[in-house]
């Protein structure tokens, strides 16, 4: 996350007062120095102790509780799609390395790219865990590419957003929104969008960017539009028709929109609430008052904001399982969950944390947000992505 020019968010309340509870014991010198913490795993890793010249940590939940040793940690930990510039992973990566001495590889991939790569390397895994869109992870599990591990605080995750076998666990959720350049809209006399139909107007469509559906964020956007026009998981023709109409008016389908947005080359984009809010309140590259984020309905009030879960799972036969388990525990701890919230990513443990006041009002989410049958989506996801891509004439489908 880019350091905010406006200072830290005003997150208050008892749930936010605790620091890292991980208890780290130094093995250097004649004595040992232990950081304070209850070792419960609710706000960091379990307590550490010294063994064979290195710290050890208690990790895992229930039957998966075990001890890992720093002596087994790698020089660098590889986890798919843990990357700077997305979901505030940069802050989590920095804090994890600072606390445990393990840097993470900056893995700049989408969920779809991660799934393709781990499938290609299934016989000789290069990464320790999959991270990304939850349903993409379920596909990896169904392919037999994951293994069981329930991180500490696994019991705090809603039942519908984790698998009983411990192969996939949700860590955060994001909702499809539209972000636009408020200043450009005002200068050009463009009325801000209220429904997805408004994004068809040529003055908006000609400078709008959508993510392709093979990325989790792009699939979420496609499902949002599809639902807004009466589609379903069994019928994606509405979004195909929509995309073809805006494409003819100049809309583009690509990733990495932020730089083009700040330069004004694109004045509207479809991603998540996190993307727009983090850009508005945390980025130094553009003034806060130039950015606006909104949730849209369909033309007749249909819900048009898909709520997308993201999560992770260990990979079968993956290298460095000890460090991976510690990292997975950290991500699900309150300390790690706060890092998501700092960038307006709603953590899976949000009920235990106070939400920043900069989020759109809850009433806006209630009017627009929807979910789907995630089991059905898993079964049909790849055919849905392919059908949309081919129907719109996007490359690579």
Say what each PLM segment does.
Residues 1-60:
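Haloarchaeal acidic low-complexity proteome signature biased toward cell-envelope/secretome components but also
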Residues 9, 93, 119, 137, ...:
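Non-transmembrane alpha-helical segments in soluble domains
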Residues 82-89, 126-265:
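Extracytoplasmic ligand-binding site segments that recognize negatively charged/polar headgroups
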Residues 135-139, 268-289:
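A ligand-binding cleft/hinge motif common to bilobed small-molecule-binding domains
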Residues 156, 240-244, 251-254, 287-316:
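Periplasmic-binding protein-like
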Residues 310-372:
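Mature extracytoplasmic/periplasmic domains
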